[in-house]
Swiss-Prot record:
The gene is grcA. Keywords: Organic radical. The modification Glycine radical is found at G100. The keyword Iron does not apply. One of its GO terms (cellular component) is cytosol. GO terms for molecular function: formate C-acetyltransferase activity. It comes from the Bacteria. This is Autonomous glycyl radical cofactor.
Length: 125
């Protein structure tokens, strides 16, 4: 479980008023903000915080430990891709992003090419 705290008293002055996310399952602390001594997003063992007093800080949105979003950006026109399906010899160097990898459009099967076109160009969100 992840909880948020603000350190109100500590032997280490760098911890004073800093805000942390504590992961009790991993015994890790992630710095959200500190005035000095620690960087934002720095992860340390919870035990490295030493002895401290703190107050709870509400986490408005539950953090995602795993998962997330993935975005492929292709700056193309639908007409260009459709023409590349019909006339691959005109576009030997046409490269697109698929699942984070750069791939030559002509190396995809026709079905994969049509799928890329359908997913890349939509009428509405």
């Amino acid at each position: 479980m992840i909880t948020g705290i603000q350190i109100t008293k500590a032997a280490n002055d760098d911890l004073l008023n800093s805000i942390w996310l504590l992961d009790s399952e991993k015994n890790e602390a992630r710095c959200v903000v500190a005035t000095s001594g620690f960087e934002a997003d720095q992860v340390i063992a919870t035990s490295a915080l030493g002895e401290y007093e703190s107050r709870d800080v509400a986490i408005e949105k539950a953090p995602k430990v795993e998962g997330g979003q993935h975005l492929n950006v292709n700056v193309l026109q639908r007409d260009t891709l459709q023409d590349a399906v019909k006339h691959p010899e005109k576009y030997p160097q046409l490269t697109i992003r698929v699942s984070g990898y750069a791939v030559r459009f002509n190396s995809l099967t026709t079905e994969q090419q049509q799928d890329v076109i359908a997913r890349t160009f939509t009428e509405t969100l």
